[in-house]
């Protein structure tokens, strides 16, 4: 085996390790490389933010809401605008249950080839579909990928651009045990968890959710929305800037 091939295999192994294990040591690097994105919110309070992407879904979103209610937990739902227009009753139910709605763009697809005008228009269409009122506004790009200029445009529209620090890649349908393990090992004050309720079949995510919530409780952590975590934070989102938590 040549040194070049060994180097390629080593890099591939490292990439797979980072992708599937998500060591916390990678976070500071990501934060320095992408300062327009928030991955976690520093806080001394025992709080973790839970978020769900790609809804609302007429079958799976209600199941997630029922589990959250049973565990007295709250979350931020990053909703796709065109799906919100198809299911306004679910948007209303999410809000009525005390959860937070946030902008996940109008369609579910890559943003990389969208013009600035199209990006701004779809961002505003989704905001109108969700009825986002005054207060902190959060945007998560589809697939977690956007050009720097698009992130700056979102910020110019008053949005904080949010990713996360515990993501089990549930759209790839990994085992329930992996979803539970990956999220649970990364549950620390200030963690932002990314899960999906709007993918084709999030059954494993829904099965893992009660276990994740129970693990957080055993760690003495309370599950809240991103806005609530920001209000208790030291830094990260603008709403945390005046916090006395640190």
Language-model features: locations:
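His/Asp/Glu-enriched short active-site or ligand-binding loop at hydrolase and phosphoryl-transfer sites
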Residues: 145-147, 151-186, 220-232
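C-terminal domain-boundary segment and adjacent tail
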Residues: 24, 28-44, 70-72, 203-246
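Active-site beta->alpha N-cap acidic-glycine motif
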Residues: 22-112, 118, 124-125, 129, ...
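Short histidine/acidic/glycine/proline-rich micro-motifs that form metal-
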Residues: 79-84, 107-110, 145, 167-170, ...
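Charged helix-capping and loop-helix junction motifs
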Residues: 116-123, 175-181, 206-211
